[in-house]
């Protein structure tokens, strides 16, 4: 199957904990004076750590730069110090220190030595930025600023006081890493490396870039050196690699070593030209801002100007290089080391295939470029995993769906989960290995426990008959009573009523016979390993006592002494011999349990990480589908939750049930066959075969019933969620009883299926226990017959029973494994059906990043019709574009062509259903037209990266749906990195700030489900504030005032006009009074453009469609105005 769409701002490889550190060292050198190149639509800069400046840092002679950490173009006081450009001559209220070439914007009147913490002071001595700066990036941590979509600065627009305020808001003291389009420039102009952004780049090749804010001040000496024709003129510029590169316009003096991570110092430095300046102190480097990417330190480099940025101290503007943000054409490569990776990119000489390889520098550059190119195309293990964009199914183990074919079988589904068993993260791999080790150890201890128990029984079997723990020692009336009778008779001979001498001789004969029996017993071989070997000392003493009884006969005192000695020695032997066996059995059981719990603890994190990654992948995939028209939200939630649980359950089945159960079966059968005999092993094998066959047959039936139950549950939950979402409609139409009857019918069907599942489970459990216990009965009967015949010791009965009971656990797991695996595969199959839906729109393989030039929009001969039905699971998306030519009768849009110039306002009107909103979807590329082209700034949207141009478009829809969260969250959704001040400024322009502040909780007020706690006008104005905060280049309003009253409409129109100022605006309007000031009005009828022109031009047409609609609305408004007093009086 085709891998599902991966949004370029969702790096799944990071979810697995894979980390790679990439280090590049670059130099920031003095820039030549050029025109100011700030554009009108700067994206707001991101948060940075606020450092309160000291009083000394504001001394004018130190050439300080004061930079705002986060200023919005919406705010009226954006004061940032910047370096002067010859083309910009600031006027009041700007002033420049006479002794400095820097031209700071004057700060607010209350800005004094106790400046707010949001202002930072950065020394700008000539040596401050001339030393190499070492940037260390780590792609495992990203800022939320990555996900906000704000426009960038075009490089070619001239500066002006109006646009300067927007432009400066994007810069900060850490502007070394900036967003731009490097690969586009490299493909179209390889020599762009030497042109930079000095104002000489033409518009065709100009890419969005931002000049470095922090530049060393150019004093008189440096200006004199810059005017020297022989001196190389370095130029700083910025690319999508977010790395500052310094190159020289003088090609013969290039000394950059193929832009590798160790750029050689330039021969001409400002330090030589301005040697009177003191070197940069360490304190000034540490005053540079730390980032929002969570804490960090500034490491001390090799030189005073060295700075190391990591994800802990790097600004969100300094986003790390990641393959998801680069097309494959970016000529970067890496050489991975133990802890870092170095960047390299081809030099101008190798890129343009020049012949300037006579010098050593050019040769070095070409060599490095060659190795860079080969490293780029290489997929060896030494290349960095974070530089080249690879296929989603190869780069990401978090999405096994991309490895499964359409409509996969159960075996294919299981194999698709195997990558989870060997994760990418080293810690997770160690957890898996530890889990396997604990599993094997627990199984060995589990099998060893029955053996220890059998040895314990055998140890008691070989005890002496007259020991205290033996039957003979426990009762004087049992066991071997000959010696006790002898002693009793001997003691009676000492009594006053002594027997005659004949009695003594009979006692002597009895003692002699007892001695022979004891000698024979001492030489008997026991049926136990513990009985093998020479006779024990107690047996020898009993034999000696027998001999003494024969020789002495009536010497009763000697017999009594021998018996006492024998009892004392046997007691010591009983305590010492079986104690280890007695303790070994419980210790083995406890250790096995401990290792099992440790295994579960180690693997839980691995399985939960896998489930989390899989759910994130499914979540992202759902957002790429046009699927929600056919499935209820409740059904989708149940489907995804069950699918996630099935992933975790199946991972445990694969690693801890299938293989361990087979291993335990083999061990048990081997022990039974070797210790007890082949018949017992055969009986056990037959029992297992019948058990498995019965379980498979019953579980197959249960799986079918379980699928029906799951379908009924999904329908029940979907109906519940759908009914609750439309609770107001239910109350309005008094349909509570109808909804209850529908829900009751679905619930009863679910209950019936649930009862069937439980009944089949009870039958399965009873059958399993019956089969198993019959097998146990047969094995024990055979073992007992062998023990009774004297062929096996008594302990083997315990061994067989223990092993069979031990085998009951995996036998039960065989049924559980088969049953749960079948059910989990059924749940996972449903999820795979959803995941196998292909998104209607995907990025092209060679997608280009969008280059903003102003925001002009053009539709050229567009024809479009919606697909007749949604995609079926596993089917490929239907062809769209020039290959498919639907009939004109089915066309929603037929040969529509118009253009919107940059910064202009165009309105689209017409009856309902003519395709006005469809134009917005085509502009966003939610669908592709059947024919024709949609262009933005002369770039076909089919050839662009989806997110690169969608970030430049802001939409205010007709039905504004808000998240069930706070107002602050909903407004900042347009730009999550915005500050509270920027949010308030956007809300004020949207005429909603006063309403929010009157609420008890202000911006922390929760808006409710879909924002139903707010009125329609309030939701619309929150949507406008969100779009204002996003600051897009193209603004789209889709009938945003059609359902509002006139008073609210006027407020929203005022916010519209504020937002549309300086932006390309596309308005779909129902009320013509709202678009009378549009630069162009397009009237659509039956999928075609019927009329086009300005408001005045269209009204001049006598029988024009627009004029008729205008007159109709004016007449309706007049009637409403006349009837309003009557309604109020009544």
Curated annotation (Swiss-Prot):
Signal peptide: none annotated. The keyword Oxidoreductase does not apply. One of its GO terms (biological process) is intracellular iron ion homeostasis. The chain crosses the membrane at residues 406-426, 574-594, 653-673, 678-698, 761-781, 791-811. Gene3D superfamilies: ABC transporter type 1, transmembrane domain (1.20.1560.10), P-loop containing nucleotide triphosphate hydrolases (3.40.50.300). PANTHER family: ATP-BINDING CASSETTE SUB-FAMILY B, IRON-SULFUR CLUSTERS TRANSPORTER ABCB7, MITOCHONDRIAL. This is ABC transporter ATM1. It comes from Toxoplasma gondii (strain ATCC 50611 / Me49).
